């Protein structure tokens, strides 16, 4: 259950403080230029330890491609990528060995598996998302061949909403903020929480541009449904909107419907998806992250024996996870769209005839 | 791509105005009492034509079980269920044969497949959800064996929010309203929109109670992620929250974390899921529906040849889809949880030993 | 676990003496002409009750298409087909209700599920293969668009081997014999066994012609491996050969290797598959069927309570199942190749560019 | 398409002369003791370079576990294992860079993908099977907990058949011969072929003992069908028999049926499988390997430009692949049975109740 996708299938493995994390990406068409620098750059964007807004854990996150690439191009065989863990201060975690940190997966992993790798959250750590970013980078390379681009940025921090959405600006922002005008306020909110040994939540806007019409496989592999799954699978995600999302439910049909002219859709309230299929407009989704559960205040909890304890965490944690989450959201959307691109290639007999006849 | 689930796999088929719709449910453990009356009752709850708040289309939605049940019990083989379409006024749709209705899947199906069954939306019609309700009813029967119950109701109509959540009341309400105190206002909003030939949106709260700890398969079959997919796959759904959802992103970590005592979790902001795995609390999700796209006002659109047209729909449509959507949301959550129950049965070696040794 | 295929996915349902059997075929590209007469003809070829060489059970096997076809063409949505059971003499089976027939699945179904639909073997009956033939017929229609043809015939009965392989002749033979010169002997062997209340086994040769190079997905969806699975899943199948099969293992490498010239491969010992991928030559497989387990002699067995019993079957059974098995083998090979055709459409970036750019 | 299994899912990656080969094994229940020495020993059994009967390529095949194991036990998360390639004499292959070796996958990979990693066969090399053996070793550890054992050995070399099947003896034989009395003849046949720069084929018998009744998921995940797929997916495999296999087709039903007494089945012609489900008897399968295609004689072929060439291979190759193939066959059968064990855990409601209630 550690695989994602139907035709472009990512399988990830690895624990926060194990030997390595990594992924196997199966289904990449042969003949794609695999730009390793680009992949590494994507990982560097997600990498912790770069600013005071994120965890101080310093991982170089150097990715190695083990297979599937020959002379710079994909061969059609699975692309395995591995990142060996370096900065694994496992000692930091010895004190929480038998304790369930509130808001964390400790409690559920323990009960589900009867055992847990407690070091840094083990498999449940957001560190796993580095593997997704590596796979997502390959998906982006594939999408680029078709002119499709996926971008993301932070649109809300602690309730402070972006009014403008400048995806280029986000690329340069330490917190991937989409709106330069509220970025300062947003940063202050993060630092204020950090100083109070607390954390804040936020939201990320993800956008794909230049999609062909037709991506998405009704009824149970709809583009919007799979995007929802993909984004909700990111650590700390608690809500997903497609297009106007929740806001659409407060409009009248006559307001919300995207009417059509010769030039295309007049509006894009739908977020580029109708009936689970892309309509050619920008695909827009929003994912909402809870505040980081790792805070440095005393909290009530229990240990594995059911005894009540007071937890006070040590270690290094992001006071705001949505920033790095935006890089992961991009990766997930890229993977979803690339998968849908492959799936849709056989939707019509005429497509197949172009390939074979 | 018309299948859902990994161990309990529902495959649906059928078009709104074709011969029949139906489903095949594979993976139901043998020995389950299959109460056909219960299944039919579930379908009756979703069935249109019962009140002025829903479409006047009258379908008896009589379900026939074709296989997988012998002498009242499941045999472990696939359970096929079929509902023959009766009230198919296909003529109603001849006028939109070549036209793309705004807000509908007409445009995307046409482009994706190069052909569409235009009668009543064909496969993209919400009629398909009757098949889900039939399958969901079987999932509910399975869950009942373990004391797990899934319930849903409407918590918001046209921005009018429920303050109380009375799931028993919802069962008796024509619009499945959770809050009797706002129900009248909510109904008025629907009727007002209907009279204006318009439609409204809303939201549904779904809840599962009495789950064991451990359901959900990280990393890519997380309970919350799959719920998000399941709920977003319902027609007209545009957003999904788990637990506090979006609201959680506006709290501090110290507020949002569910602390733990000997008696259990102090709060349930997480909606019963940590790290993608059920924690034993109620699983809570919310799904937001856009206003019905089928409205009876003039709208701009184009036809299949790219000519601009004015669309004015006829036919019978719900002015508010979330009510019947709540029955579907229940079915989808039941299917997800039942699937997770089966999957989790092999999470520990000790579980397997209970089965085999 | 009642589904087969990855992109062209057949799900079957139904029991021998239940209400109906049928299938849902998902993934058929839109725009394919669906010739219902052809589908019915395929079913008629498999249909029992036509000669003294097969069971006297008379089923009309009238197939109804419930979905996925509009105005004679596939729409891209799942094609559901159903065959209602007519001639269900359930009384024939009351005497074996609690008994395990030797060579049958009675024993294993009972133990696996704790319950069994004993009427005519229930789900384990070869009657299920009618659903495969319906789905296979659609696969054949798809393959025909690419000039690919799948044919089969009986090449051995009770050890009497065909020396010639005339697939056209097989179409006219009551036992689908490939070799007219040994057909009489083969028929005599069947009738002799039948008279002795016994049964015989045999083998079927299946061939696909005119495949493109490239079908088959290494490493775990190889064309030969999936063919082996497909053919071995047919009732009573006990062995599968690809190309020379077992005989190849008794040659030297220098004899067995298919050398290549400008004109193509000099020989086809490989059966058209190298490394799990089609090489453009005819794909050849052989499937070996055990003698029908249903014989009308006294046999030792036990009942569900563990008591020893003497079984003496009544009812109607084929004395030789491979004949009708050859129709099923064709269907299975057609399904496999069609699935591979769809999968291979995304093997190269250049293929995708043909579809999208 | 590089994954195998439904609940115990092995994904392999890597090329013969790339950086590494490896696998990710997902679905291993938590709490299993992972004996790394045992896994390494299994790899050592398959490892080349140990005798004159196998290729001289010397790989240490040192396996590293990267994830999924904590303090010696499985945690329920994916177990990634990697083997870095050491002895990669890529130069050996430069002369066949543009040439299709007869009997190899060069031709088909080239055409399927438009590119190939020609070094040592790339992905199509039998080197990939080392990853299977690693995964299979974990499956064996799981099966051992339930008393199930899987063993294999060579039963035929160049037409020389074993008459006795001594699985313990096979463990000590350089060619994994099952029958000590014909082993010398079999070895001579291999060496004689080797001296003639040729190769021979053979067959392997695989056996699983002590299975519970009930493993196998009809209709399309039958134990025998999936075994056939698993064994046929091994490099150079061309035929698979279950139980008596082909021989059964030459018996009468009255001879072939395994009659039953209180003490169990009187015979085991079926190879332990009825209706696709294990019946508690030994599961028996045979897999037939073609002679190694890599021979050191002149052969006719073409190059990537279609020019006719004479190929004369250099490099190091097994003159007889079935010996090492027997280790792989064991691994594949272990994986299949372990997967079926997990799947069957939910076949009955009563099983689930044992886990949850």
From Swiss-Prot, chains A, B, C, D:
GO BP annotations listed: amino acid biosynthetic process; aromatic amino acid family biosynthetic process; chorismate biosynthetic process
Disulfide bonds: none
Catalyzed chemical reaction(s): 5-O-(1-carboxyvinyl)-3-phosphoshikimate = chorismate + phosphate
Annotated positions binding NADP(+): 46
Entries under Gene3D superfamilies matching the protein: Chorismate synthase AroC (3.60.150.10)
Cofactor list: FMNH2
InterPro entries the record matches: Chorismate_synth, Chorismate_synth_AroC_sf, Chorismate_synthase_CS
EC number: 4.2.3.5
Pfam families, alphabetized: Chorismate_synt
GO CC terms in record: cytosol
Keyword Lyase: yes
Job description of the protein: This reaction introduces a second double bond into the aromatic ring system.
NCBIfam families: aroC, PRK05382.1
Subunit relationships: Homotetramer.
Protein name: Chorismate synthase
Source organism of this protein record: Nitratiruptor sp. (strain SB155-2)
Taxonomic lineage of the native organism: Bacteria, Pseudomonadati, Campylobacterota, Epsilonproteobacteria, Nautiliales
Gene that this polypeptide is encoded by: aroC
């Amino acid at each position: 259950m550690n695989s994602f996708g139907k035709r472009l299938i990512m399988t990830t493995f690895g624990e926060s403080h194990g030997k390595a994390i990594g992924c196997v990406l199966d289904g990449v068409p042969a003949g794609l230029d695999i730009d390793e620098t680009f992949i590494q750059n994507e990982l560097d964007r997600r990498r912790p330890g770069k600013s005071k807004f994120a965890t101080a854990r310093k991982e170089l996150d150097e990715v190695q491609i083990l297979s599937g690439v020959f002379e710079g191009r994909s061969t059609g065989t699975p692309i395995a990528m591995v990142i060996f863990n370096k900065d694994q201060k496992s000692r930091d975690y010895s004190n929480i060995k038998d304790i369930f940190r509130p808001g964390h997966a400790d409690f559920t992993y323990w009960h589900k598996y009867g055992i847990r790798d407690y070091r840094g959250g083990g498999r449940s750590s957001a560190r796993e998302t580095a593997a997704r970013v590596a796979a997502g980078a390959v998906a982006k390379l594939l999408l680029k061949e078709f002119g499709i681009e996926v971008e993301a940025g932070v649109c809300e921090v602690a309730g402070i909403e972006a009014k403008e959405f400048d995806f280029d600006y986000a690329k340069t922002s330490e917190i991937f903020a989409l709106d330069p005008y509220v970025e300062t306020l947003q940063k202050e909110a993060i630092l204020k929480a950090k100083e109070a040994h607390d954390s804040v939540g936020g939201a990320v806007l993800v956008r794909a541009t230049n999609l062909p019409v037709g991506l998405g496989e009704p009824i149970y592999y709809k583009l919007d449904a799979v995007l929802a799954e993909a984004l909700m699978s990111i650590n700390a995600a608690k809500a997903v909107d497609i297009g106007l999302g929740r806001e659409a439910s407060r409009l009248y049909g006559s307001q919300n419907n995207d009417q059509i002219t010769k030039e295309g859709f007049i509006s894009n309230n739908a977020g580029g998806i109708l009936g689970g299929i892309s309509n050619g407009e920008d695909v827009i989704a929003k994912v909402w992250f809870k505040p980081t559960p790792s805070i440095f205040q005393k909290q009530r909890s229990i240990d594995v024996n059911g005894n009540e304890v007071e937890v006070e965490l040590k270690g290094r944690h992001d006071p705001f996870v949505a920033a790095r989450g935006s890089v992961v959201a991009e990766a997930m959307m890229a993977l979803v769209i690339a998968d849908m691109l492959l799936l849709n290639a056989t939707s019509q007999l005429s497509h197949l005839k172009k390939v074979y006849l």
